[in-house]
Structures are given as C-alpha cells and as structure tokens.
Amino acid sequence: MAQKQIKVTLVRSVIGTKQSHRDTVRGLGLRGLNSSRVLIDTPEVRGMLRKVDYLVTVSEA
C-alpha cells in the first residue's frame, strides 16, 4: 500500500519568528514564500507542521 502524502506550502514569511521555527521550516524543505513540498505523512512531519501551523498550509497531495 502506498504511503499517504501531504502537500505543504509556506504562506507566511519566517521574518520575525523564533529561530527554532525557522529551523523547522527549513527542515520541512521549504525555502522562500509560496514554496511547496510533497512529504510523506508521518508523525514526525505532523509534529513539525503543528509547530509552525501559523506559517504553512497543508493539503492532500
């Protein structure tokens, strides 16, 4: 069975955010504003998304 995937898009700038939140965004593979990545839906990724939920949008890939 194929693993579930999610699409993550950075919709707010990381300027003025905590360094740990900036590091989390980079860890998700997001660089500039409106950049997107398709990631495998794992508990680790979900935890990272929960930490920066005010900066990103999540949709099914």
UniProtKB/Swiss-Prot annotation:
Q: What is this protein called?
A: Large ribosomal subunit protein uL30
Name the Gene3D superfamilies on file. Answer: Ribosomal protein L30, ferredoxin-like fold domain
Q: Which GO terms describe its molecular function?
A: structural constituent of ribosome
Q: Which GO terms describe its biological process?
A: translation
> Tell me, what's a Pfam family for it?
Ribosomal_L30
Oligomeric state and partners? Part of the 50S ribosomal subunit.
Q: Which InterPro entries match?
A: Ribo_uL30_ferredoxin-like_sf (IPR036919), Ribosomal_uL30_bac-type (IPR005996), Ribosomal_uL30_CS (IPR018038), Ribosomal_uL30_ferredoxin-like (IPR016082)
Per UniProt, the keywords (alphabetical) are: Ribonucleoprotein, Ribosomal protein
Q: Which PANTHER family match?
A: LARGE RIBOSOMAL SUBUNIT PROTEIN UL30M (PTHR15892:SF2), MITOCHONDRIAL RIBOSOMAL PROTEIN L30 (PTHR15892)
* UniProt family annotation: Belongs to the universal ribosomal protein uL30 family.
The protein's matches in SUPFAM superfamilies, at most eight in alphabetical order, are given as: Ribosomal protein L30p/L7e
Q: Which GO terms describe its cellular component?
A: cytosolic large ribosomal subunit
Species for this entry: Bordetella avium (strain 197N)
